[in-house]
Structures are given as C-alpha cells and as structure tokens.
C-alpha cells in the first residue's frame, strides 16, 4: 500500500472530496469508522478546548463549545463536510471503544468521546455512533487497528496512527488491490449496520447544531 502523509495526504484527500461533489449526491454516502484509541494524542497538548474542559472540572459548558467552534470551523474537513450536508449526502461517524476500559478511562479519552467527537459531528452535520469493541467481536466483526473511511465515489481511505495522531493515509483507489478494497467496503458497511442496530446514537451538543450562531 502507498502510504501518504503531510501535504501529499491532504492534497489527495481534497481530490477525494472533489470526486464526491462531482457525482450524483443521491448516490453518495460518507462513513468513518474510528479504531479505539490506545495512546494519548500528542496534538491535545495545548489544545484550547481540551484545556478549557479540564479547567471546568472535565465538564463542557458554553465557553468550551465556543472555543471549540472558533478553532475548528475553519478546518478543511468541517468545510467539506458541511458542503456535503448541504447537498444531502449522509455522513456517519462510528467510534469504537473498549467497554472493559471505559470506567477507568483517562481524561483525554473521555474528552475525545464526550466532547471532541460530538462537537465535530455537530459542526460537520454527522450522525455519531458509539459502539463497544467487545460487542463488535461477539457479532463476528473483525478488528481494525486503523481508521476506515468511505468518501462515496472518492473511495476508501485508511488512516494509521503514531503518538495518538494520524501518521499516514492510504487511498485504496490508487493501489488497485480489488480484494482489499472489497474487504474494507464490506467491513465499513457491516459496521454501519451494526452501529445502527446495536450502537449508541450520541446526543450532540445543541450549542453547535445547525442554526446556532456558529
């Protein structure tokens, strides 16, 4: 697989989005399956919303949401996802967590699950589901130690991590491995069906819903 990082990965992701926008919106869907985090994300150090949340006793209030919106609304993903939402393209994010570790989860993981991802989903127009790894395994779904993302006609992108942050991306349409592409398509569609049937649809912060001042 050809792994891209940095500006090359960002440029290729931009091409995938443009492919989505160039096709019939009614035939498009976007799905993200996020693997369970195992490392503290280095980018959280000094990230203002995370620090504001910590100062507020690990609780999100209007100031936390406002800080988050001010920082993230300019992000390319938020802009592209909002454009997709305006075109009626469904966007689903599925976050995998280990039930056995959740009650003793570190603060950074609770921030990701309870603040960061719900805020991204609200601003981007996503549906956000939380699923337990143990339930996925019981249902016969195989583990992934990387993210699997479907960008409609733009194809599937895999994303791997180092020090808790995305380190590389692979665009399967570029590699021509039909077997791998087929397996990942099956996986992401199975995870979507599983999340709808047995996952938790996460309530998103109303402060960031469409129609809010953000």
Where are these regions (language model features)?
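HKD (HxKxxxxD) catalytic microenvironment of the phospholipase D
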Residues: 133-176
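A short acidic, often aromatic-flanked loop/helix-cap motif at beta-alpha or helix-coil junctions
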Residues: 39-40, 135-142, 179-180, 209
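Signature of lipid phosphatidyltransferase scaffolds
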Residues: 162-214
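Intrinsically disordered, low-complexity coil/linker segments enriched for acidic/polar
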Residues: 5, 106, 125, 199-200
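Extended, compositionally biased low-complexity polar/Lys-Gly-rich tracts
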Residues: 81, 88-94, 114-117, 130, ...
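PLD-like (HKD) phosphodiesterase/transphosphatidyltransferase domain
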Residues: 1-101
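Short catalytic/ligand-binding loop motif for oxyanion handling, primarily in non-cytosolic enzymes
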Residues: 39-41, 100-104, 157-159, 166-167
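HKD-type phospholipase D/PLD-like phosphodiesterase module
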Residues: 97-144
């Amino acid at each position: 697989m050809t792994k891209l990082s940095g500006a090359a990965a960002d440029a290729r992701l931009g091409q995938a989005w443009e492919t989505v926008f160039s096709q019939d919106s009614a035939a498009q869907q976007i799905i993200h399956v996020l693997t369970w985090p195992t490392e503290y994300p280095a980018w959280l150090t000094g990230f203002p919303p995370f620090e504001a949340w910590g100062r507020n006793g690990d609780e999100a209030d209007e100031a936390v949401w406002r800080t988050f919106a001010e920082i993230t609304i300019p992000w390319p993903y938020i802009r592209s996802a909002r454009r997709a939402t305006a075109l009626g393209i469904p966007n689903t994010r599925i976050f995998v967590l280990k039930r056995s570790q959740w009650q003793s989860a570190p603060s950074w993981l609770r921030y990701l699950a309870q603040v960061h991802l719900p805020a991204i989903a609200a601003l981007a127009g996503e549906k956000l589901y939380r699923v337990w790894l143990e339930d996925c395994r019981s249902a016969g779904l195989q583990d992934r130690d990387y993210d699997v993302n479907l960008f409609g006609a733009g194809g599937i992108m895999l994303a791997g991590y180092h020090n808790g942050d995305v380190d590389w991306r692979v665009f399967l349409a570029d590699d021509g491995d039909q077997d791998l592409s087929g397996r990942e398509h099956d996986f992401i569609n199975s995870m979507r069906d599983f999340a709808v049937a047995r996952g938790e649809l996460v309530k998103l912060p109303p402060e960031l819903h469409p129609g809010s001042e953000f």
